[in-house]
Amino acid sequence: MEKMRVIVITVFLFIGAAIAEDVGIGLLSEAEAYVSPKLKKFITPCTSHVGETCSTTSSSGSEALMQNQGGLALCLFDSMERCLVDHGAQLYQTSVTNLQVEPSEVFPRKNNPQGGRKSKLDDHQVQPLSFRLPPFRLPPMPKLGPTSPIIRTIPSPPIAPRDLSLIETIQLRTALRTCTHVTARTCLTAPNVATSDLEACLTPSMNQCIYPRGAEYGSPPIRA
């Protein structure tokens, strides 16, 4: 019962995150679409790649899709997200708990009638689902003598530097959605992609939107 309650809470967290992300697109302006500097190591290698990928209709895969700002923004967002994942930004990992879930608890099945066909779930051949975290190791205990004072050791939680929290993931994806629309609106000055000078515009526009000048704790935009 406790496991099912944790599962339900986790599902509601993801639903709330998706709603917050979609609402945030309309609330953020270009100057507010700011991402923490510690995520810059994921952003920097990808902006130039995305600018090159979406600057021509042949690389986008659909010429009809790229004839308007919405199609260009979609290309920018999808390409940016794929590039971030390729560079190690785990956007969808959470650190809720190391939860072991049996398939029979999530999808309860009635017993098959005698002589009926059995599935793998009936034979318990399916491995349990799990949200895996890095292994937790306790620090070594100090050697105590007969006159040593009592020492309480508080272990530190494991650190996963490449895993983004749920809040960081929402912040990053909301900023990317906002900036891809801003960049598409800024750079698509001609009737379509083929006649627009996108390659020289996409990269600096994305960088300026994600890291605007004067942002608190921020840094100047990346030069192309």
UniProtKB/Swiss-Prot annotation:
Residue ranges of coiled coil: none
Signal sequence region: 1-20
Claim: Signal is one of the keywords in the record: yes
Highest taxon listed in the record's lineage: Eukaryota
GO BP, sorted A to Z: nodulation
Function noted in UniProt: Involved in the infection process during the plant-rhizobium interaction.
Family: Belongs to the nodulin 20 family.
Protein name, per record: Nodulin-C51
Taxonomy of the source species: Eukaryota, Viridiplantae, Streptophyta, Embryophyta, Tracheophyta
